Regions:
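ATP-dependent phospho-/nucleotidyl transfer catalytic cores
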Residues: 90-144, 206-211, 219-222, 234
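Short, low-complexity, polar/charged sequence segments that are solvent-exposed and flexible
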Residues: 62-64, 117-122, 193-197
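Short, residue-level hotspots on alpha-helical faces of the histone-fold
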Residues: 67, 71, 147, 201-202
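Conserved ATP-binding subdomain of kinase catalytic cores across diverse folds
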Residues: 1-111
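C-terminal catalytic region of ATP-dependent kinase domains
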Residues: 165-246
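Conserved kinase catalytic-core segment
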Residues: 124-183, 188
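Generic recognition of cysteine residues
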Residues: 59, 98, 131, 185-187, ...
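Short secondary-structure boundary segments
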Residues: 16-51, 113-135, 224-240
Length: 246
């Protein structure tokens, strides 16, 4: 699958609805869905302001994290970045949108980890302890490390999903997804970009651990065995390929 489609597509037909915005900002994140060759496709926009239009860069962040996860050998939902004309409230916007396939397989139903925890916890175990008891420690440790690397601001309990399949009698965690609110997502001007300290620890909404992505690393016992792959200097070209002008 080609990660970035630069040639502009006509995607004015999808109807956009409000997605969950837990970042504390006044704007919104719009989502939609469609079908390509009979396969369901999910679309989402970057940060949208009703007066200023689409001013965020969350969709570009998704592609960068997608590529980073692939290099590191992390199971994740794959995204495609598409240059497109879209229509919101009878107004056409020239923008970039993210597209992804459904990570559920036939017979799967999904619930948030937050809900799964509330229904199935046995006592006062922490979110991290609960995941460990269910055999998901490696997954969670990997997620914590990824969130630290990208400064993910929004790993709430609905951004981690549990998949059930009654026919297969299986319960598993969904691949990592939804990484738009990361990197420099809070910067909308050149001045804000210049002032942003990439080494500063910032408060984030986390379902597991504290509000600090750095402090959460203390939960990981074997930090040297987190990733199957290794990030190299030359991988910069892969991470940012075809993103000039986005």
């Amino acid at each position: 699958m080609k990660k970035v489609i630069v040639e502009k597509q006509d995607l004015r037909h999808p109807k956009w609805s409000h997605g969950r915005n837990s970042s504390g900002t006044a704007g919104t994140f719009l989502k939609s869905q469609g079908s390509v060759n009979g396969e369901k496709i999910y679309y989402k926009l970057s940060y949208f302001d009703s007066e200023k239009g689409i001013i965020g860069h969350e969709c570009a962040n998704e592609i960068i994290v997608d590529r980073l996860s692939g290099i590191l050998g992390v199971e994740h939902l794959e995204y495609q970045l598409i240059h497109a004309d879209i229509e919101i409230d009878d107004k056409v916007y020239d923008t970039w949108i993210c597209a992804s396939k459904d990570f559920k397989t036939r017979g799967d139903t999904k619930t948030t980890l937050d809900n799964f925890y509330q229904v199935n916890r046995l006592g006062n175990e922490s979110h991290y302890e609960f995941c460990n008891e269910n055999g998901w420690r490696k997954y969670i440790d990997t997620m914590l490390a990824v969130d630290y690397l990208i400064l993910n601001r929004d790993r709430h309990g609905a951004n981690i999903e549990v998949l059930r399949n009654s026919k297969k009698r299986s319960i598993r965690i969904a691949p990592l997804f939804d990484h738009g609110l990361s990197f420099l997502c809070s910067c909308y001007t050149e001045e804000e970009l210049d002032k942003f300290d990439i080494l500063m620890d910032r408060p984030c909404q986390n379902f597991i651990g504290s509000r600090s992505t750095y402090d959460k690393l203390k939960l990981i016992e074997n930090k040297s065995d987190i990733f199957a792959g290794k990030l190299r200097v030359q991988d910069e070209e892969i991470l940012f390929r075809d993103l000039d002008g986005v």
